[in-house]
From Swiss-Prot:
Residues 1-22 are annotated as: Disordered. It comes from Staphylococcus epidermidis (strain ATCC 12228 / FDA PCI 1200). It comes from the Bacteria. The chain crosses the membrane at residues 32-52, 57-77, 95-115, 127-147, 284-304, 315-335, 623-645, 649-671. The lineage of its organism: Bacteria, Bacillati, Bacillota, Bacilli, Bacillales. This is Probable copper-transporting P-type ATPase B.
Length: 674
């Protein structure tokens, strides 16, 4: 739990680094209320913007009270901005904090000068001070930043919730059978923990006793409860719905699923996309723009009116109204929100550039088995082509060779042989034949399991009519070869996933062409494609063929997304403009791919595209607001419309500046997946 909270803390700091004041977060609320106590007397005892009100709360020496309280307020309430500005200058990245620090410093220093002139100088006339403006300015800035920091924190709320899923303690089953409550940090791999109904599962693990239904909605976004039996994996942070289970711990701390996800999200939030680099650059220039406009406005108004009070007010207002912060946070806040929402729903964004590229995708290429289909095969037909070998003997030979493989087709054959009580042996020297099958020794005889492409390539005879009949029914067909003779075959069917058809329809509605890439035979590939509505099919592919096909499509200027197994399809995922590893489960860190889909649900492909579209829309809105606000507000503050009576005071400027950032934060917070 400590680790997860630390991960969240680090993540939170990372998406606030643009502000230059993340470390003042906890102080803004306290500083605001303490500063309010000092500010109220200043506001009551000072003339409002140089205007003597009908009611005056003054007394002999009250100007000294104002001076002392203003000095305390300047150094106490203004400290976050003064130290923030100092930090920005030290890193040679002056921004919003520097502008605010300049604004309040100019107001304070000039007010000291005015105090001296009014109380110790023999000069006639009254010099207006800015103590009232200084007090309201600091108050508004503190309040604005307090509200803003809350809004910024909420942007990553989904990730914060994930960090809080793990319990602080767990019930450990000791070697003697006794139960003992221990801290999560004391749990080790291979320990046995007991989890009762309704409790949060403390770590990733395997159920060794009991069965239950698990609520993974807060961990992977899976809305339905998942039935779990003995030997099934469970994820730390998910909720045990019913029944007491005992879980053997498989991963703790940094190796746990939640920690991996938060680590990946944290990394993604720290990596800057091209759009963010651009906005950072513009925000950097905005500081110099504001300072130049402020100085020019001061000079111009001095030339026009020869009124130092009014000219200085323009300068201070320009400095406090300019907000590079709104521009600097425009993208990071949306990123924090989108990556958090994605992780909460089992869509882990490892490469943020992919969110921008997703807007321009022309083709989505998908592996058939496991992506479009369940990958849970059933044996529909098996047959011997050799008179002295029975059908069950052929099944036994298939199962013997396949017992060394973890491919879905292999697992299906082994399970089927067991269900038929057909015995099989451990083969020797088993080797994988890439894109074909495998070979090995059984009773000193060499056998090969191949696909139909291998038979055609080596001109081996087989029953073409039987193949066509079974393949058109959607079966994947494997052949058994001994001494370059086909001695048997097995046909296995796979179910199309419920959400595949809708996913294909959604892609087509977005003018994105779905493409099937498969090592399976043409007949099966086209049968599945026809049912799904996919017209672009590439079958009987070797692993390296997928990568070259992607390359061909890209050579025509197309943007290609590849969806496949994060390990077996790694070269293709890397070659594509966006690589999506589907069905990663808890192994989110080991997969290739820009995007990791924890579940094997094809609809998550569309969910990612939707999230990308929504994210980019929010980014554009925030950038327009951040840039547009400054383009309009800075000239107004300089007095561009003073000739029609529109003049902004420093206090109003401070309100607008604070609001500009809060609006950006709130807009980011309204980002949704759907």
């Amino acid at each position: 739990m400590n680790h997860s909270n630390q991960m969240h803390h680090d993540n939170h700091e990372s998406h606030n680094h643009h502000s230059g004041h993340a470390h003042h977060h906890g102080n803004f609320k306290v500083k605001f209320f303490v500063s309010l106590i000092f500010a109220i007397p200043i506001i009551l005892l000072s003339p409002l913007m140089g205007i003597n009100l009908p009611f005056q709360f003054t007394f002999p020496g009250s100007e000294w009270v104002v001076l002392i309280l203003s000095t305390i307020l300047f150094f106490y309430g203004g400290k976050p901005f003064l130290s923030g500005g100092k930090d920005e200058i030290a890193t040679k990245k002056p921004g919003m904090m520097t502008l605010v620090a300049l604004g309040i410093s100019v107001a304070y220093i000039y007010s000291l000068y005015a105090f001296y002139m009014n109380n110790f100088s023999s000069a006639t006339g009254h010099t207006m001070d800015f103590f009232w403006e200084l007090a309201t300015l600091i108050l508004i800035m503190l309040l604005g930043h307090w509200i803003e920091m809350n809004a910024v924190g909420n942007a990553g709320d989904a990730l914060k919730k994930m960090a809080e899923l793990l319990p602080n303690s767990a019930i450990k089953v000791m070697d003697n059978g006794q139960r003992e409550e221990v801290k999560i940090s004391d749990i080790m791999t291979d320990d046995i923990v007991e989890v009762k109904a309704g409790e949060s599962i403390p770590t990733d693990g395997i159920i060794v006793q009991g069965q239950t239904s698990i609520d993974e909605s807060l961990v992977t976004g899976e809305s339905k409860k998942v039935q779990k039996n003995q030997n099934d994996n469970v994820i730390g942070g998910s909720i045990n719905g019913s029944g007491t289970i005992q879980v053997k711990v498989t991963a703790v701390g940094e190796d746990g699923y939640l920690s991996q996800v938060m680590g990946l999200v944290n990394q993604a939030q720290n990596d800057k996309s091209s759009a963010e680099l651009l906005s950072d650059k513009v925000a950097g220039y905005l500081f110099y723009f504001a300072v130049i406009v402020g100085v020019i406005s001061f000079i111009v108004w001095m030339l026009i009116q020869n009124d130092v009070d009014f000219a200085l007010e323009r300068l201070v207002t320009v400095l406090v109204i300019a907000c590079p912060h709104a521009l600097g946070l425009a993208i990071p806040l949306v990123t924090a929100r989108s990556t958090s929402i994605g992780a909460h729903n089992g869509l882990i964004i490892k490469n943020r550039e992919s969110v921008e590229i997703a807007q321009h995708i022309d083709y989505v290429m998908m592996d058939k088995t496991g992506t479009l289909t369940e990958g849970n095969f059933s044996v529909n037909h098996y047959e011997s082509f050799k008179n002295d070998l029975s059908n069950d003997t052929i099944l036994s030979l298939f199962a013997s060779l396949e017992s060394q493989s973890n491919h879905p087709l292999a697992i299906s054959i082994v399970d089927f042989a067991k269900s038929k009580n057909v015995s099989f042996t451990n083969p020797q020297d088993v080797n994988n034949i890439p894109g074909v099958g495998l070979e090995g020794l059984i009773d000193n005889k060499t056998y090969k399991i191949t696909n139909v492409s291998y038979l055609d390539k080596h001109k081996l005879n087989y029953d073409d009519d039987l193949f066509t009949k079974l393949a058109q029914q959607g079966n994947s067909i494997s052949y058994l070869i001994e001494d370059q003779q086909v001695i048997g075959m097995i046909a296995q069917g796979d179910q199309i996933k419920e959400s595949s058809k809708q996913m294909v329809a959604d892609l087509l509605s977005r003018n994105i062409t779905p493409v099937m890439l498969t090592g399976d035979n043409n007949e099966v590939a086209h049968a599945v494609a026809k049912e799904l509505g996919i017209s672009d099919v590439h079958a009987q592919l070797m692993p390296e063929d997928k990568e070259s096909i992607i390359k061909d499509y890209q050579s025509n200027g197309n943007k290609v997304m590849m969806v496949g197994d994060g390990i077996n399809d790694a070269p293709s995922l890397i070659r594509a403009d966006i690589g999506i590893a589907i069905g990663a489960g808890t192994d989110v860190a080991v997969d290739s791919g820009d995007i990791i889909l924890v579940k094997s649900n094809p609809s998550d492909i569309v969910h990612f595209l939707t999230l990308s579209n929504n994210t980019m829309r929010k980014m554009v809105q925030n950038l327009w607001w951040g840039a547009g606000y400054n383009i309009v507000a800075v000239p107004l503050a300089a007095g561009a419309l003073a000739f029609v009576g529109l003049i902004l005071s420093p206090a109003v400027g401070a309100i607008l500046m604070s609001l500009s950032t809060v609006i950006v934060a709130i807009n980011a917070f309204t980002l949704k997946l759907k």
